[in-house]
């Protein structure tokens, strides 16, 4: 079991998150022939908005982040990153469930894009996201606030061991 916390992200977190992103996205970007060591980092630096971003911490250490950015017709789920050694342990699902409470309360759509072939797509589908469109690199998904199948969450944070697409950030 791992204890996790969400906290407001800050500019001081940026470079650590940039490095997490480079590790997390490398395999998918290489598979798509799009990995560039500088670009994978710079795209996050250019798009980072700490006011919409939560840092994910386990045992006081920064292990990822997620952003929920309001737009004209929906929220955009962006920059959902979790260090590889903690993936598949329920933390991502619990964090996503917590984050989606806001659009659910507000009756708002949530949109995201994920790289084609990414294992993360299954996580999003389990939380009610469905295909909206796709291109050669990205899959665009949308979630109606009533379509969510809730992930089991403990009362503590304990979990088992406008329609214009958001700017791409590979």
Write out the residue ranges for each language-model feature:
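Conserved active-site tyrosine of GNAT-family acetyltransferases
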Residues: 44, 124, 129
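Conserved beta-strand in the GNAT
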Residues: 61-69, 76-81
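Conserved beta-strand-loop-alpha-helix junction that forms the acyl-donor binding cleft
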Residues: 87, 111-121, 137-144
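A short beta-loop-alpha structural element at the N-terminal edge
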Residues: 4-19
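Conserved GNAT-fold acetyl-CoA-binding loop/helix
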Residues: 22-43
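Conserved GNAT acetyl-CoA-binding A-motif
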Residues: 74, 103-115
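A short helix-loop-beta-strand connector motif used in the catalytic cores of GNAT acetyltransferases and
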Residues: 45-55, 64
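Conserved acetyl-CoA-binding loop-helix of GNAT-fold acetyltransferases
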Residues: 82, 88-101, 121-126
């Amino acid at each position: 079991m791992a204890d996790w916390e969400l906290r407001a992200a800050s500019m001081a977190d940026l470079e650590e998150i940039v490095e997490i992103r480079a590790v997390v996205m490398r395999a998918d970007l290489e598979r798509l022939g799009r990995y560039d060591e500088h670009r994978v980092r710079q795209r996050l630096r250019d798009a980072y908005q700490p006011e919409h971003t939560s840092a994910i911490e386990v045992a006081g250490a920064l292990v990822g982040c997620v952003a929920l950015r309001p737009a004209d017709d929906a929220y955009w789920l962006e920059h959902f990153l979790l260090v590889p050694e903690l993936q598949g342990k329920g933390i991502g699902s619990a964090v996503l469930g917590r984050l989606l409470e806001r659009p659910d309360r507000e009756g708002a759509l949530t949109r995201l894009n994920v790289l084609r072939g990414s294992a993360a797509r299954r996580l999003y589908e389990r939380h009610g996201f469905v295909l909206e469109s796709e291109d050669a690199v990205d899959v665009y998904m949308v979630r109606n606030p009533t379509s969510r199948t809730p992930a089991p969450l403990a009362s503590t944070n304990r979990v088992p061991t406008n329609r214009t697409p958001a700017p791409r950030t590979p």
